[in-house]
Amino acid sequence: MTTLPARRLLLVHAHPDDEAIGTGATMAHYAATGAHVTLVTCTLGEEGEVHVPELAQLAAAEADQLGGYRIGELAAACRALGVTDHRFLGGAGRYRDSGMMGLATNEHPRAFWQADLDVAAGQLVEVMRELQPQVLITYDGNGFYGHPDHIQAHRVAMRAHELAAAEGFAPAKVYWTAMPQSVLEAGMTHFAGSSDNPFEGIQEAVELPFCTPDERIAARIDATGQHVAKEAAMRAHATQIPDNSWLYSIAGNFGSEFMGVEYYTLAVGDKGPGFGPYGWEDDLFAGLPVAEGSDRTPVADGADRAPVGATGQR
């Protein structure tokens, strides 16, 4: 019998750096408030670009050592976020970065895009069985922006939830990362005519694959107090996010609002009490019995064992 914090949050991301960019503030917020935060990363990000010139030979087309290097970057990012429980799905290196949609790398025999859905989902089910999180975060069906590994992460997470539900320990709520249309429109207006406009060529916010109507947003997590932690986590991924990245350009203009506020749609579960015209939640655990307090909860049946197919810092 192992005791864990009463509030337990599980995130499933495709590559190292996705956790920091998309959910870093949320992770840091819940870790700082005593929740048990677990990150499962599905690949090592072997096909990523290398933005550090002296490390260029690590690229997939050269020495193909980038994945191993990114393990260290991810560990540093987790430290910045205060997250101590990280695992790679199936173990580090089990699934390879598939590269962008339509590339030959999609067909690599270890590409995550080629993974057997039930096998990969079963590996995630073991993590769910061990930790029994109440909340799961992953991407929508388009993987937020269409990357095959993001789409596959969505499929694996949702299949794992289905399998866990059949055994009675599925997370009560499943959220998908999202960006409200109003926030994107405000950004486009702000950067219009700017030399560093990250929305160059976009006429309407709805053209962006991750644009979500405000009324479909379920939760707005204001973790502006953690914006420094999120930026530190992003900077830990130096091979992927150069100092002149448009991400930092937006942050420089919007500051803690950009770095510290993250949005989600609710895919599974009942929405809790919210605020504003659309009733946005300000807590992912809203409406759940563990929404208040930080008591520790016993977790049995496997909590003392290392999860099948999962490795990482604990």
Curated annotation (Swiss-Prot):
Binds 1 zinc ion per subunit. The keyword Zinc applies. Zn(2+) binds at H15, D18, H150. The keyword Transport does not apply. It comes from the Bacteria. It is an enzyme of class 3 (hydrolase). GO terms for biological process: mycothiol biosynthetic process. Residues 291-314 are annotated as: Disordered. Keywords: Hydrolase, Metal-binding, Zinc. Catalyzes the deacetylation of 1D-myo-inositol 2-acetamido-2-deoxy-alpha-D-glucopyranoside (GlcNAc-Ins) in the mycothiol biosynthesis pathway. This is 1D-myo-inositol 2-acetamido-2-deoxy-alpha-D-glucopyranoside deacetylase. It comes from Salinispora tropica (strain ATCC BAA-916 / DSM 44818 / JCM 13857 / NBRC 105044 / CNB-440). The gene is mshB.
